[in-house]
């Protein structure tokens, strides 16, 4: 949601969530205890567990690229407590949780008793104002000083206190603040101008004069505000204002000459005007409308005298919290809550888009594209029709019709939606949306102007930069999370509407603390697994076959950056070891290495064709060096596959791969067949081996295989052509990119669509492997090395 955003009464879990400090309880991690726990893991982890057990002491002592001090881990119990607190807050979601608005509260406080008596209709609002003045005499966000925010909140509160002649000391202190700071208006970043400020603040100045307050209305700092007001009012078509729901309904209190009979046709079902307290209070003062009174009475009672900027905001909150949990790498802990939120969003989806609440009469592009992307990625069918409502005749995409300037964050969310959730056969609007948003963001990036009109976030520029540099197809989950840990502002992020406001549920320190603790645990496990993998490579003399520590590290990184859950070590290491062995065999085949003999390849195929037990009993048939490769393959097949059926499946997969390798002169290993071998290995190591059984494959599985093989083959052939410098033309490269993009859309549709025949995690395996190929093709070796360092070895602080 953009520019519209209310606090739910803090539940116990939410209150605890807010009280969590950024500090992290740290204790020394008990590696021997972890080794004992691993020893009790299921037997099919086999050599993976044994390697980790044997490497644990060395892994503690050996700290390559980590530095002199190693980050101490969160106790599992403490992480579980944080997960429990977050889960409770997610399950207690109501109308939305944002902070209160002194400005809106002041407008409600101005409503006189409707029964004809003296005094305010809502005296609790006066009490709230008196109790929430800041030490400098102002009202507003206490952690971020924006001149406009402090002035509009403070002046509104001063007017309310003066109107009822109460708390004169607070009134005078607030008035002094206004006089002292009005000259500072030009200091604010133009991108951060409050919505409607140019019409609302001059209105407040006139109201202040009417109640006898001395106002510096001729201050030079106000001249620009007056000019913007006159320009905006001249541009507003009064007929549209009174007949079509627009964002202007948020600022009715700053609009002259309103026709209330016509405007009430735009009143929301809950009695408000666009679910906002200030325009609703103004309408109540002007008309005495009972539905306005009911809305305000409910709000003020619910929040004990305070009024939020807008309420409810439950649709906005539910969508955004899913996005934050996924990007922080925490989604696996909250599957049920995420599913519930998206089911709610889908119930209220329309082809005209969505807004910040289910009954919102004004849809915005930000909520719409965030919902569009997340719903599609979770198997819901949503069409592209909604995007057309935000495309202008000039080919631009806007948050609202009639907006005065563009939003960086909204265009970034539009780009993410068009990049990540485009399917074959989509209307051209998706392609146009991607092209427009990409061009806009690149232009703002080039000019160094990535501050946004809707959110104040120090991490937004780097977030946008990373998103533009790494399109979704080449963006690995754990790399994205590692970057987002530095971009996610937590409770420091401030949203801009008519006032500054904060969304407590999805911008808080507990989310950040939990995500960092979880990622640190992941890093510790990766370092242990890497030590085991490196030792395994050394034991089997794989360096003799061209496997360097760097190439083995890269193979492990690609696996861990995709499959990162703590209980999926077998899948990670199965992927990594398969990639390493495939590289070793390919190197032998393609080089003049003395060990790369025809007899060895024939022997490998022969062993795979046999009953599967000869590998362990081959005696002196091969040299010690050759035995290393056979040993490695033997361990992978017989020890990582749980049960004879699984090992037979994996043996058959290797046989197929080897035969394709010999048939195609070794080049095929760079692409599709190796990718399918990785997929089948991951599935077998996970225990989901029935899906990889050639005789049990449903049609959808075959389609996933076909697309994965095709994409990875194209990327592999492109890499080979670059290495061989065979004169590939730019046109050919562009054609190849277009084909890959088209097939990636097909693969995404196959993976995301909801089907019961194949599990979601199995479909994700195809996507993980394919995106890893895209990532390697997209990234320079230096970039990959920097990501390895950041994801695995650089402590999260």
Question: Language-model segments: which ranges?
Answer:
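Terpene synthase/cyclase
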Residues: 1-797
């Amino acid at each position: 949601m953009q520019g519209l955003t209310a606090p739910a009464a803090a539940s116990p879990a939410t209150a605890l969530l807010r009280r969590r400090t950024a500090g992290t309880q740290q204790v020394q991690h008990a590696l021997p205890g972890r080794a004992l726990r691993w020893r009790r893991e299921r037997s099919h982890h086999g050599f993976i567990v044994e390697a980790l057990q044997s490497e644990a002491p060395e892994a503690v002592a050996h700290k390559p690229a980590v530095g002199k001090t190693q980050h101490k881990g969160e106790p599992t119990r403490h992480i579980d407590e944080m997960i429990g607190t977050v889960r409770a807050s997610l399950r207690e979601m109501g109308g939305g949780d944002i902070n209160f608005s002194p400005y809106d509260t002041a407008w409600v406080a101005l409503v006189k008793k409707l029964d004809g008596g003296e005094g305010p209709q809502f005296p609790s609002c006066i009490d709230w104002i008196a109790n929430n003045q800041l030490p400098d005499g102002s009202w507003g966000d206490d952690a971020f000083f924006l001149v406009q925010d402090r002035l509009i909140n403070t002046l509104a509160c001063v007017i309310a206190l003066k109107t009822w002649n109460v708390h004169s000391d607070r009134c005078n202190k607030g008035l002094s603040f206004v006089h002292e700071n009005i000259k500072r208006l030009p200091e604010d970043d133009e991108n951060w101008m409050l919505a409607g400020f140019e019409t609302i603040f001059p209105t407040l100045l006139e109201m202040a004069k009417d109640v006898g307050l001395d106002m510096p209305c001729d201050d030079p700092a106000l001249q620009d505000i007056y000019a913007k007001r006159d320009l905006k009012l001249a541009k507003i078509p009064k007929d549209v204002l009174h007949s079509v729901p627009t964002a202007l309904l948020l600022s009715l209190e700053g609009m002259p000459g309103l026709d209330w009979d016509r405007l009430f046709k735009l009143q929301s079902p809950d009695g408000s005007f666009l679910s906002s307290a200030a325009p609703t209070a103004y309408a109540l003062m002007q008309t005495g409308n009972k539905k306005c009174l009911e809305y305000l009475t409910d709000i003020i009672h619910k929040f004990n005298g305070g009024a939020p900027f807008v309420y409810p905001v439950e649709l906005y909150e539910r969508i955004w919290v899913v996005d934050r949990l996924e990007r922080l790498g925490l989604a696996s802990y909250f599957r049920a809550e995420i599913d519930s939120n998206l089911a709610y969003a889908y119930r209220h989806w329309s082809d005209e888009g969505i807004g910040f609440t289910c009954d919102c009469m004004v849809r915005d592009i930000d909520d719409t594209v965030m919902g569009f992307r997340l719903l599609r990625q979770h198997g819901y069918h949503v069409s592209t029709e909604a995007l057309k409502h935000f495309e202008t005749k000039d080919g631009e995409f806007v948050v609202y019709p009639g907006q005065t300037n563009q939003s960086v964050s909204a265009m970034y969310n539009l780009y993410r939606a068009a990049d990540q959730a485009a399917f074959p056969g989509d209307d051209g609007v998706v392609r146009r949306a991607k092209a427009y948003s990409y061009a806009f963001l690149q232009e703002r990036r080039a000019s160094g102007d990535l501050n946004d009109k809707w959110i104040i976030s120090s991490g937004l520029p780097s977030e946008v930069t990373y998103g533009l540099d790494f399109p979704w197809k080449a963006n690995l989950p754990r790399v994205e999370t590692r970057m987002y840990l530095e971009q996610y502002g937590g409770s420091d992020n401030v949203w801009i509407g008519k006032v500054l406001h904060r969304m407590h549920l999805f911008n808080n320190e507990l989310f950040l603390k939990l995500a960092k603790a979880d990622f640190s645990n992941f890093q510790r496990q990766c370092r242990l697994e890497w030590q085991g993998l490196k030792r395994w490579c050394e034991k089997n003399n794989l360096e003799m076959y061209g496997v360097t520590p760097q190439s083995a590290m890269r193979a492990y990184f690609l696996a861990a950056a995709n499959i990162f859950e703590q209980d999926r070590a077998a899948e990670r290491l199965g992927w990594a070891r398969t990639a390493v062995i495939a590289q070793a065999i390919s190197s032998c085949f393609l080089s003049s290495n003395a060990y790369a003999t025809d007899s060895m390849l024939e022997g490998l195929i022969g062993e795979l064709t046999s009953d599967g037990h000869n590998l362990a009993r081959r005696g002196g048939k091969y040299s010690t060096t050759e035995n290393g490769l056979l040993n490695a393959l033997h361990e992978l097949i017989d020890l990582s596959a749980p049960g004879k059926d699984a090992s037979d499946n994996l043996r058959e997969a290797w046989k197929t791969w080897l035969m394709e390798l010999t048939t195609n002169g070794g080049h095929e290993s760079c692409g599709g067949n190796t990718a399918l071998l990785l997929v089948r290995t991951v599935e077998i190591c996970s225990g989901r081996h029935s899906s990889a059984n050639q005789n049990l494959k449903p049609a959808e599985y075959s389609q996933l295989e076909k697309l994965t093989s095709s994409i990875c083959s194209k990327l592999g052939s492109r890499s080979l052509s670059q290495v061989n410098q065979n004169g590939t033309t730019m046109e050919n490269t562009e054609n190849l990119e277009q084909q890959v993009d088209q097939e990636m859309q097909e693969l995404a549709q196959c993976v995301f669509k909801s089907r019961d025949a194949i599990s979601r995690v199995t479909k994700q395996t195809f996507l993980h492997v394919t995106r890893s190929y895209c990532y390697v093709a997209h990234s320079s070796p230096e970039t990959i090395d920097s990501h390895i360092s950041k994801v695995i070895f650089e402590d999260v602080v």
